[in-house]
Amino acid sequence: MKYKKKEKEELKKILTEEEYYVTQENGTERPFTNEYWDFNGEGIYVDITTGEPLFTSKDKFHSSCGWPAFSKPIDRSIIKEKVDKSHGMVRTEVRSKLGDSHLGHVFCDGPEELGGLRYCINSASLKFIPKEELKEKGYEEYLELFK
């Protein structure tokens, strides 16, 4: 599957206001009220703007942060990290590599047994693809993650 970055004008047409705000304006959605914070489906999470595979449900864990939390991305090469000094804090921002979408932040307070990282990701930046639909939606290569 080939992924493509969309122009801002196209994104404004296809994304909700919140999805656009989060992914294109570095926004943050409200905790504990977003779509995936307590979701437990089996599958992968992709960038809502490009379809790039980002995270798998196998690496998702329950955290008290109010947003979906993952121990690692599917592949580190598909994300980029940068220093974020907004809101009087110093954090590490996580963005999708191709789409350059703001996803959330990564922290070093994740479960030690999972590597110690917590990728705290906005649901509004993600689209969930259920395991049962991976083949039909062009993500067949990721089925092996669930064997």
Swiss-Prot record:
Enzyme class, first EC level, given as a word: oxidoreductase
Q: Which catalytic residues are annotated?
A: 120 (nucleophile)
Superkingdom of origin organism: Bacteria
User: Could you say which EC number(s) this protein's record lists?
Assistant: 1.8.4.12
**Which residues are in the MsrB domain?**
8-131
Family membership noted in the UniProt record: Belongs to the MsrB Met sulfoxide reductase family.
Write the protein's name: Peptide methionine sulfoxide reductase MsrB
Source organism per UniProt: Clostridium perfringens (strain SM101 / Type A)
Its ancestry begins with: Bacteria, Bacillati, Bacillota, Clostridia, Eubacteriales
Supply the gene name: msrB
